[in-house]
Amino acid sequence: TPASTMKTLTAYAAAATLDMGSTLETQTYLEQREDGTSRLVLKGNGDMLLGVGESDSAHINGRAGLGTLAANTAQALRQRGITSVTLVYDDSLFGNDRWPNGIAELDPDHVYYAPTASMAVDGGRNWNGANPTDPDTFSTYPVLSTQPAREAALVFAQRLTERGIAVNSSVEQGAVPDGTSPIATVSSASLNEIMAFMLRHSDNSLAEEFGRLLALHLNAGNSPAGAVQSVEQVLAQRGISTEGLTMVNCSGLAEDSKLTAHTLLDVQQRNLTSGSGSAAAEGLSIVGFVGTAANRLNDADEAGLIRAKTGSLGDVASMTGNVS
């Protein structure tokens, strides 16, 4: 059982295929109805690291802030003479199938996986007021939301109200009207930065999301199964050995996944020798410094020389990476 070292396969496939310099936008759309009411749609495009306040250029987690989006939206609404709206959120990006095989059985308390969503605040983490000082650095696992997009929409509604726009009725799901353009947008950190965050925190939700983004890019099935198929497809196309590979999901949070050390080594070699895998290589935890491998060091002279992806699942402990 590879545990979270499986994430290196997903990371390589995504980095080799997607535009890793691109960002994920969260947007608002306005529909002005014939009865004189205004319907505002909050649409996510995959940013599961939204912040609750102003956009934060200094961090990956919170790079795009719902407070900033609310301020820009409120300004656009007031310019149109609108001071009250009905708010809905569009969470249609990843369809209806959000739970990969193998995860529910291993995560009954919802501390290792938040369902893949078009948007989420801080990956769906609920800190109960004990938020870490640095949003990019933490080592504990709080309970995760099972409805991250809805909770992001509720935060946005609050921020909009604070900026003088009344939100009528409860916040429900809806769709962006055809032919409309966004009135406000905030952008995530780059996919390259998000991948580093995913690998260093061994974030299962983001690992599964990279698989889903890859599947959408390749026009594969919009499902966890489509994500797995897409990763396997890219590995095979790139000549990476998949002999003995059983990939239950994209994160490794599954008891029945299997892969060989040969495949792990193949992936690491490609990361180091091809530009397309650099994001997956550079994002690994740095032993002695950052990520899940920060405290796995016996010799202080080795600090900073080893980049590693750790894996831990029950009695299983695994590791893969590279040495400078």
Feature-to-residue mapping (PLM):
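Short, mixed-charge aromatic SLiMs
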Residues: 31-45, 222-225, 233-237, 286-298
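C-terminal soluble interaction/assembly domains
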Residues: 243-324
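Short, well-ordered secondary-structure micro-motifs
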Residues: 52-53, 99-100, 209, 221, ...
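A small/polar active-site loop signature that marks catalytic segments
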Residues: 124-278
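Active-site-adjacent loops and short helices of periplasmic peptidoglycan-processing enzymes
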Residues: 1-142, 146, 164-196, 200-206
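Short, solvent-exposed secondary-structure boundary motifs
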Residues: 18-21, 232, 236, 309-314
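Active-site-proximal beta-strand/loop segments in catalytic clefts of secreted hydrolases
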Residues: 43-46, 89-92, 123-124, 172-174, ...
